[in-house]
Amino acid sequence: GRGEDAILDRITFRKIRMDHVMTPFCANSFYFCDPDGKTAYVQSREVMPVDERTPAMKRFEFSDIEAKNCHVAASYFEGLPEKKIEEIVMKNVSVSFAENAKSGVPVMSEGVETCSKRGLFARNVTKLVLDHVVIEGQVGEKLELHDIDEKIVED
């Protein structure tokens, strides 16, 4: 939700196996299931002033994870334009898609298009580290990166 007390930091996922999930990795600053989630303020992609209503998404780490037979997207990360997700680290991550993948929206947010077999999407992130990240079977680009300040990709 919105608010300066809404802080996500040091979120770590490690040694996980997933099968037949829609979008295995997501962090979404425009979540619409809170009471104010569908208001113009929450859903606006315009730069807003940073004030007591501004949440913070800081560090996320995903390591040693296999997600197979996925459907919608390999990942969907979207921070606020005025307060980006500070850091996302993905290390030793493998994503593959189901042959007959279902379509859906990758996150609960207005204005996000339905898709299937989409690659890794990230917008409004200060630092993105992709260390031995494998994505197989996607339709279109493996990486859709927008407004990323620092990107480190290692095979």
Task: Identify the residue ranges that each predicted region occupies.
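Extracellular/periplasmic carbohydrate-active domains that bind, remodel
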Residues: 1-155
